[in-house]
Amino acid sequence: MNFCYDVLNYKYPSRREVVYGRKGMVCTSQSLAAQAGLDIIKAGGNAVDAALATAACMIVLEPTSNGFGSDAFAQVWMDGKLYGLNASGFSPALLTREALMDKGYEQMPKFGWEPVTVPGAVSGWKKLHDRFGTLSWEKIFEPAIRYAEEGYVVTPVISKMWRQAWDDYEESLSPELFEEWRKVFAPDGHTPRAGEIWSSKVHAETFRELAATDCESLYRGRLAGEIDSYSRTTGGYLRKGDLAAYEAEWVQPVSTSYRGYDVWEIPPNGHGIVALMALNIMECMQFAAGHDSEEVVHRQLEAMKLAYSDGQQYIADPRSMKVTTEQMLSKVYAAYRAANIGQRAAKPQYGNPASGGTIYLCTADGAGNMVSFIQSNYCNFGSGIVVPKTGIALQNRGFNFYMDPESANCVGPHKKTYHTIIPGFLTRNGKAIGPFGVMGGFMQPQGHVQVMMNLIDFHMNPQEALDAPRWQWTGDMNIEIEQGFPMDMAGRLKARGHHVTVATDSMNFGRGQLIFRDENGILTGATEPRAGGAVAAW
């Protein structure tokens, strides 16, 4: 007898606890990908090899969030030092404000060729592999190729996102562009339902070509030619020259101290410093009440609004920024901003400092090496553009550009836009604690702040810190809170002037993972119930 049940609705919250390991650990939102990454460690690979294998698997297992056309960022703790990688691509040389205005655009389109930027993730993979990798590309890509060729069972959350993408692209794309997306991602005439099997031979072949060319084909080989040809024939801006000119870059992570801990993020063009600015503001305050206090939530929200207002005003391609990262992270400036927080909700305004669909994963090996890695096509599958015969779904990161010529983030040729994806890392006294991240667009800095405060201020264990109900600022005076706060929380916040919505769906509140390593080498991992993920441990 077959049971009849709904895999998209869960009446009772899952009871999760932290997971322990010693020799290796991988956390991500897809259990098959986590297991594949751990298998790489068991085969003799290190944390970077595992991160690359997991990231490759996620392109197949969660195509609703990332792909060959993604951007990526990473923080790597290796041999006692923290390294940062910015693998975000720039806009095509042909993408100018004037070209868009000539087509009648007053703001950046969300889908189609206009928001497509150079995919940076694969170049980032190569940078990581060249510097830290120990296994061959053939070995690293083996699990992803297997899932692409043999297929896998689509999970409930992913099936829901897949269906939403169909609706978005069918409405927004030309029939020609939508048909290429449909051929790969809905070959049976509908998107895969939960429990159905999806496979993609073209994904497997692209992985094989990347392995054979040391990931060069996407930028200076056959795959680059396929992208160029399709772009030219369908009205796109991206050319082989743009791809050949791009290379991911190593960067120095930036940090702030928060109550004795150092919280690390990638510097702009990403908005990780928004989380650091908010933590700087919060450090100016002391909290007698706990996480569920309306006073705490009010102050967190006001700090987040101030930090985000500054971030959205100033963060852009570093070559175009009008203030420095150091100015934005000044403790003196944070104290000035904190003094603006009162008992009532305030309309957010940026200050004047003195002269970010996504997947997140983290890995650790037995030698103490750890990786915080994030990769994204931005909105679901991205732009909706799928290059024929390759499985390459191109991102729509350019949607974050502004059309205002006075903005540092104004669209322009070979320019990096304001970026939402941010991998985090935590240290104390120069020693690694571990990687953490919360995927989910503009929720990401808000998630980072809440998870860090849950751990440091409210002394929650890692699983509690992820499980705890969250709030998010959605713009102007508007906020959303999850179910799980005290029943009178919404009313109390409304009395302070916040415009409050109690969300019925937790999908928009981020989906996080973390791994911490103690002084004895014990690994502690956690992943949250908002995602269908898992911790794979050894």
Identify the residue ranges that each predicted region occupies.
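Internal maturation/activation junctions in enzymes
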Residues: 3-6, 284-377, 389-390, 397, ...
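Active-site rim segments in enzyme catalytic domains, especially the processed small/beta chain
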Residues: 60-77, 81-86, 237-239, 369-434, ...
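Short beta-strand scaffold segments in enzyme catalytic cores
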Residues: 66, 71-78, 359-364, 423-425, ...
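Short, small/polar residue-rich loop motifs at catalytic or cofactor-binding pockets
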Residues: 250, 355-358, 419-421
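Glycine-rich phosphate/pyrophosphate-binding beta-alpha loops
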Residues: 264-272, 358-362, 374-385, 438-445, ...
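Extended C-terminal subregions enriched in glycine
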Residues: 367, 415, 448, 457-507
